[in-house]
Amino acid sequence: MFPSWSTTFVLCMGLCSLMNGALAQYDEGASIEDFEFRSACTTANNVCERMADTCCPGLQCIGCNPLDPDDDGHCSCQ
């Protein structure tokens, strides 16, 4: 049948405490250098330079066409 409300509550609280512990361990591993890097890699309006690696990890500086004479070299992090 269905578990009682008290059993459901205890299971939920147990899972919540496990998740909080996992998040705390993740945060302990992050250093101030990691935080500074993540802050520094955020670009204004997702604009990046073609020749500079300013996008955050997981994003690429794309949207430029170096063969286009009207291309100003500004791309977007996507």
Swiss-Prot record:
Expressed by the venom gland. GO terms for cellular component: extracellular region. One of its GO terms (molecular function) is toxin activity. Keywords: Disulfide bond, Secreted, Signal, Toxin. Belongs to the scoloptoxin-13 family. Contains 4 disulfide bonds. Its main location: secreted. It is found in: Secreted. This is U-scoloptoxin(13)-Er1a. Residues 1-24 form the signal peptide.
